C-alpha cells in the first residue's frame, strides 16, 4: 500500500489541489518521500491529516456510519473543507487505485466526478445544513468492504498474523520521553489498536511505555526482540542496551562499555538517543507488510553525524516490509538525500486575498 496522491481544500495553510507522490522519471509511486517548505507551510498538518483520515476509516469500516461528535478524528477533520487520500491499492484486498475522502458536499462530488479511475471506498460529506452523510460506495457491490473490515478486526482484537497494511504516524511534538511513575514494571499487555494506527503517546503510566512494550516483545517474539536491540545499539556510542533482564526487576539497563557493573536506565539516555529508540522500535515492532510510515522531523535532536545512518536504517525497515516512508525535514542534507534517492515535494501554500 502506497499513497499516490493527496487532494486538499482549506486544509490549514496548504494550497488547494493535488499533491502527487508519483516519481517524475519512473512514473511509479515513490516509496520514499520528503515534504519540505518553510515553517507554517503545512508539513505537519498534512501528515496529521493522513493519520486522522486513516483513523476515521477504521471507524467507518467497523460501524458503517458517520463519526460521532466524540471521535477525535471528527473534531480535527471537520475543520477543513476537503481531504482525500488515494492509494495505489490496499493489498491483498484491492490491487488498483482506491481512495478515502471527507469534506464539504460540493467539493466531494466534484472530486468524485473528476477521478473515475479511483475506486472510492468510504468517507463522509457535509451538506450546507452541516448534516453529515456516510459515503457508502459499497451499495452496488455488496460485501466489497467486508474482507478488509474483517482483517482490521483481527488486527486490533488478536495477536494473529494478519495480511493487512497499517499506518504509523510519529508526530514531532509527541515524541517526548517521560519516565514512568505509575504501575512501573507490572506485566501489562500492549494495546492492540496500535496494529491499525501506531502512534507514540506520552504517558507516565508503565502501560504504553516503549520500555514496557520492548520487554513484552522479549516474551512474545524473542528473535525480533534481539534484532531490535541490535538495531538500537548501533546508534549508542560507548554504551549498549543489555538484552538480559534480571529476574524480578523487569527493567532494561544500558551498560557502559569498558566499565564493569556500571549501567543506567533507558530514562537516562540523551534526547537524541531517545528519538532513535522511539523511531526504530515503533517501526520494527508495529509496521505491517505494505504499511505506510509518516514521520515528522525524524532528525529532531539528532547529532548531524547520525542523521544519514538513522534514515538509512528506517528506509531499510520500511523497504523490507514493502512499504512507503513519508517524512518532513528542514535539514539541507536530508533535502539532498531525497532529491537523489526518492522524491522531494516542496509544499505550496494558499495565497490569501489582499
Set out the residue ranges of the language-model regions.
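Walker B catalytic acidic pair
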Residues: 296-298
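Loop/turn-to-beta-strand initiation segments
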Residues: 289-291, 322-326
Amino acid at each position: 500500500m502506497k499513497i499516490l496522491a493527496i487532494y486538499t481544500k482549506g486544509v490549514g495553510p496548504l494550497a488547494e489541489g493535488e499533491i502527487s507522490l508519483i516519481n517524475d522519471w519512473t512514473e511509479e509511486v515513490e516509496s520514499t518521500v520528503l515534504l519540505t517548505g518553510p515553517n507554517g507551510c503545512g508539513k505537519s498538518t498534512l501528515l496529521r491529516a493522513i493519520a486522522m483520515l486513516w483513523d476515521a476509516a477504521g471507524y467507518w469500516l467497523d460501524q458503517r456510519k458517520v463519526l460521532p461528535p466524540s471521535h477525535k478524528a471528527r473534531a480535527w477533520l471537520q475543520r477543513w473543507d476537503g481531504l482525500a487520500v488515494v492509494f495505489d491499492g490496499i493489498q491483498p484486498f484491492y490491487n488498483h487505485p482506491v481512495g478515502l475522502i471527507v469534506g464539504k458536499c460540493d467539493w466531494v462530488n466534484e472530486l468524485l466526478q473528476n477521478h473515475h479511475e479511483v475506486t472510492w471506498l468510504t468517507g463522509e460529506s457535509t451538506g450546507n445544513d452541516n448534516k453529515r452523510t456516510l459515503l457508502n460506495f459499497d451499495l452496488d457491490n455488496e460485501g466489497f468492504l467486508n474482507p478488509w473490515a474483517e482483517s482490521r478486526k483481527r488486527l486490533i482484537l488478536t495477536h494473529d498474523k494478519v495480511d493487512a497494511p497499517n499506518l504509523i504516524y510519529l508526530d514531532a511534538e509527541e515524541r517526548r520521553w517521560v519516565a514512568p511513575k505509575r504501575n512501573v514494571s507490572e506485566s501489562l499487555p500492549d494495546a492492540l489498536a496500535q496494529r491499525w494506527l501506531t502512534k507514540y503517546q506520552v504517558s507516565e503510566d508503565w502501560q504504553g511505555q516503549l520500555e514496557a512494550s520492548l520487554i513484552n516483545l522479549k516474551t512474545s517474539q524473542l528473535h525480533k526482540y534481539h534484532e531490535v536491540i541490535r538495531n538500537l545499539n548501533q546508534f549508542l556510542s560507548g554504551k549498549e542496551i543489555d538484552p538480559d533482564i534480571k529476574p524480578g526487576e523487569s527493567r532494561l539497563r544500558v551498560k557502559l562499555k569498558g566499565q564493569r557493573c556500571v549501567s543506567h536506565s533507558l530514562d537516562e539516555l540523551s534526547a537524541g538517543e531517545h528519538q532513535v529508540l522511539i523511531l526504530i522500535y515503533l517501526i520494527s515492532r508495529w509496521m505491517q507488510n505494505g504499511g505506510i510510515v509518516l514521520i515528522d522531523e525524524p532528525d529532531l535532536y539528532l547529532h548531524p553525524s547520525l542523521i544519514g545512518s538513522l534514515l538509512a536504517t528506517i528506509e531499510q525497515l520500511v523497504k523490507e516490509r514493502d512499504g512507503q516512508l513519508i517524512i518532513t525535514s528542514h535539514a539541507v542534507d536530508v533535502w539532498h538525500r531525497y532529491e537523489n534517492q526518492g522524491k522531494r515535494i516542496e509544499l505550496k501554500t494558499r495565497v490569501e486575498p489582499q
